[in-house]
Amino acid sequence: MDLRDLKTFLHLAESRHFGRSARAMHVSPSTLSRQIQRLEEDLGQPLFVRDNRTVTLTEAGEELRVFAQQTLLQYQQLRHTLDQQGPSLSGELHIFCSVTAAYSHLPPILDRFRAEHPSVEIKLTTGDAADAMEKVVTGEADLAIAGKPETLPGAVAFSMLENLAVVLIAPALPCPVRNQVSVDKPDWSTVPFIMADQGPVRRRIELWFRRHKISNPQIYATVGGHEAMVSMVALGCGVALLPEVVLENSPEPVRNRVMILERSDEKTPFELGVCAQKKRLHEPLIDAFWKILPN
């Protein structure tokens, strides 16, 4: 049984979405399906019940999840034991990311890193995702989780984690904005928009306006922080374009007040990854963190 197959299985068991897990594991959906089929053939049991959009674990799948978690943990512990025979790393590593990324992408990375380097102290700062790249460039953070800009600074190294789906969201509860967008062909030039004040998400909405030939959009507010954009949409202030993962990790009372109007096409993926200064990649702590990333 391949450890990579077990890692992929665990991600799918958590996400319950083939497309999302395929993007996160950097494989095609067909490759992901083959990995799951290989496990099912090895065990002689179906692991998932599939429908058009999601999957759910079978009883055999639940048992394999426990086995996979224990096996991968034991493997990490073995790696740690072997690493202890050599010089161990210690010190502080300063990481910056958004609140959403701290929930959605950072935990599994930190689990792997701390399993191998338990003496390293992690200093985590959260804030506006649009500031992440600048935090690395200025040295305020050793590493950051950031959306890849259209032009990556030459001094910055970027390791991709996932291509994120981008969605246009609107209020789900009755309000004037919902009435505007609920017709067959909304007049987007009159719909109020909540926009990011900077960063890749800001660039995305500008491209959206251009594609819809909106030269003078109605901007209700520009906001620092994608999480605040979701809250303003939930309050009925306008619509917003942002990564779907932000909505997925919003508090349930907020999430229930928002609906998705459309998803971006896959031709223009929103790349999320970890960045660091190229000239610092040789430093022991940053080098160790870089090596445990999926890429």
Swiss-Prot record:
Record lineage: Bacteria, Pseudomonadati, Pseudomonadota, Gammaproteobacteria, Enterobacterales
Cellular component, GO annotation: cytoplasm
Encoding gene (name): ilvY
Domain HTH lysR-type: 1-58
Residue ranges the UniProt entry marks as DNA-binding: 18-37
Keyword Cell membrane assigned: no
InterPro entries tied to this protein: IlvY_PBP2, LysR_subst-bd, Tscrpt_reg_HTH_LysR, WH-like_DNA-bd_sf, WH_DNA-bd_sf
Keywords assigned by UniProt, alphabetized: Activator, Amino-acid biosynthesis, Branched-chain amino acid biosynthesis, Cytoplasm, DNA-binding, Repressor, Transcription, Transcription regulation
Protein name: HTH-type transcriptional activator IlvY
Keyword match Amino-acid biosynthesis: yes
